[in-house]
């Protein structure tokens, strides 16, 4: 009895903050900022997917006719022809779909004179992302693009970190690993881009984490913390829905995954389950209202040149490259920056290894949740292609963190997923090396074009920003920053601190 009282006293006694832990938090925070800056600098304006469209839409959202003039003429359904600043005109993407051509061609495009033709959003995407980013739009396009990329990065990382902090302490290490193994390279690239897909992915992932925590929350938590949790959960949904209409579908999938993982069928969770059901319905309604079926095609057009049966057959064969393309199987940029083979090899090793460890002792609830997410991940691209359209890996990226997170998390009453030091080191090291290779290739593609090789990015530079660190320094800082982030995740995985199991109440509320 005395031993039990002593143990209880230790649990209740406020814990002193370890100075080393506080220092690690500061170092990791700095590393995340540096990492975002490196990826923001890695590509020029126009380097992100459909950047001419998204940047024109942002500047047009300012309402300033001096930087954007609408014509009322449709280029295609819900895409309007507009006149924009010369720096946003056709020369912005002069290197698109030409991997051997550097971004130096932008200097040859006119930067003076009247407005130039482009295309902008007219209902194809929700307008929230463009209106928000237009707050940072100025006539200095290069500077504005960098500011917007850092804003996108900060918003994405902030959503993920806040959601992560609300999670049960026992889940934080698995969740950190889930993000590490599913968001490289495409996720981090999009977070620091002018494409709305980045913040949409972060919003969906943050919603899934907070939805799971919400279902686990018990009566011992304070009202303030409950409201804060719900606020973060709704923020993730709103950010995702105002960025992409198809995000509503993924919100619904994330709701189902969280509900199944937490055992939402239990009587005690029925009220909270209704909240998730309502959010899922809102998400589906948003997707249907946005008629996002036209959006899937993106820049790739339709498959009208192929017979429907042949297209579906090819889509089935290509499911891995579409579903897992975000891990390096697919190119970055405007689908014109192929990744080195080592990126896909190491990321598939890390993703598959973590997934297998997570399902080694899976419960029925976990298997059901995994089946739901993976079923959508496999079936969705086939269904979309069968409708005569195409799917890029970034459209399916929101499901990867949810899938990996579902595999790695456990209910409070179940044994947590454990990682040995060797396993953790192998997984983290693989991702760190893959990230370094992906960042190097991305910078190389725009500095000289991929027809030139070698480790030194500072040799024979054809394009770079007018100020700031050079291409080689940017890569070194970005690679080092990510290595620090990887070290933080490794420390979480091997910390060995066990959380007492005490029912289903989430300690994040205490």
Feature roles, as predicted:
Residues 268-277, 285-359, 458-479:
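Membrane-lumen/periplasm interface segments of multi-pass, membrane-embedded glycan/lipid transferases
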Residues 63-142:
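Interfacial juxtamembrane loops and adjacent helix segments
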Residues 192-200:
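Short acidic/glycine- and proline-prone juxtamembrane loop motifs at membrane-interface regions
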Residues 261-262, 267, 282-285, 294-309, ...:
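Transmembrane helical bundles and short interhelical boundary loops of multi-pass, membrane-embedded
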Residues 147-170:
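Transmembrane-helix motifs of polytopic, lipid-linked glycan transferases
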Residues 210-227, 248-280:
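Perimembrane helix-loop-helix junctions
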Residues 1-37, 272-279, 425-428, 481-510:
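Start-transfer (signal-anchor) and selected internal transmembrane alpha helices
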Residues 168-171, 224-227, 265-273, 352-373, ...:
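Membrane-interface helix-loop-helix junctions at transmembrane boundaries of multi-pass membrane enzymes
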């Amino acid at each position: 009895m005395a031993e039990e009282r002593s143990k209880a006293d230790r649990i209740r006694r406020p814990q002193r903050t370890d100075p080393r832990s506080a220092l690690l938090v500061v170092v990791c925070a700095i590393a995340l900022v540096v990492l975002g800056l490196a990826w923001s600098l890695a590509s020029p304006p126009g380097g992100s997917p459909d950047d001419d469209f998204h940047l024109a839409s942002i500047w047009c959202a300012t309402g300033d006719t001096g930087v954007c003039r609408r014509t009322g003429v449709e280029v295609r359904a819900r895409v309007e022809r507009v006149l924009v600043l010369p720096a946003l005109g056709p020369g912005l993407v002069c290197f698109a779909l030409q991997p051997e051509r550097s971004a130096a061609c932008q200097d040859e495009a006119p930067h003076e004179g009247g407005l130039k033709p482009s295309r902008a959003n007219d209902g194809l995407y929700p307008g929230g992302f463009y209106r928000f980013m237009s707050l940072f739009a100025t006539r200095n396009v290069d500077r504005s693009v960098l500011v917007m990329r850092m804003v996108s990065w900060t918003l994405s990382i902030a959503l993920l970190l806040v959601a992560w902090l609300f999670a049960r302490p026992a889940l934080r290490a698995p969740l950190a690993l889930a993000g590490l193994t599913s968001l490289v390279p495409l996720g981090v690239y999009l977070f620091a881009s002018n494409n709305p897909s980045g913040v949409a992915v972060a919003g969906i992932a943050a919603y899934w984490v907070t939805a799971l925590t919400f279902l686990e929350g018990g009566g011992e938590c304070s009202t303030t913390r409950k409201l804060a949790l719900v606020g973060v959960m709704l923020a993730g949904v709103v950010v995702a829905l105002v960025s992409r209409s198809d995000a509503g579908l993924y919100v619904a999938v994330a709701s189902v995954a969280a509900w199944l993982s937490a055992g939402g069928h239990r009587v005690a969770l029925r009220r909270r389950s209704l909240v998730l059901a309502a959010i899922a319905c809102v998400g589906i309604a948003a997707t249907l209202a946005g008629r996002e079926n036209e959006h899937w095609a993106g820049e790739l057009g339709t498959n009208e040149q192929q017979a429907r049966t042949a297209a579906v057959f090819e889509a089935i064969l290509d499911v891995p490259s579409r579903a897992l393309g975000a891990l390096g199987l697919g190119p970055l940029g405007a689908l014109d920056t192929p990744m080195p083979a080592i990126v896909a090899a190491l990321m598939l090793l890390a993703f598959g290894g973590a997934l297998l460890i997570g399902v080694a002792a899976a419960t029925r609830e976990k298997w059901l949740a995994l089946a739901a997410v993976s079923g959508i991940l496999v079936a969705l691209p086939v269904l979309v292609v069968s409708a005569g359209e195409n799917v890029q890996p970034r459209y399916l990226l929101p499901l990867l963190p949810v899938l990996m997170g579902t595999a790695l998390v456990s209910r409070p009453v179940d044994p947590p997923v454990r990682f040995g030091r060797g396993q953790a080191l192998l997984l983290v090291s693989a991702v760190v090396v893959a990230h370094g290779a992906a960042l190097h290739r991305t910078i190389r593609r725009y500095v000289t074009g991929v027809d030139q090789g070698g480790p030194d990015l500072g040799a024979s530079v054809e394009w770079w920003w007018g100020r700031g660190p050079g291409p080689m320094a940017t890569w070194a800082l970005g690679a080092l920053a990510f290595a620090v982030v990887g070290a933080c995740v490794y420390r979480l995985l091997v910390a060995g601190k066990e959380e007492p199991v005490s029912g289903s109440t989430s300690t994040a509320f205490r």
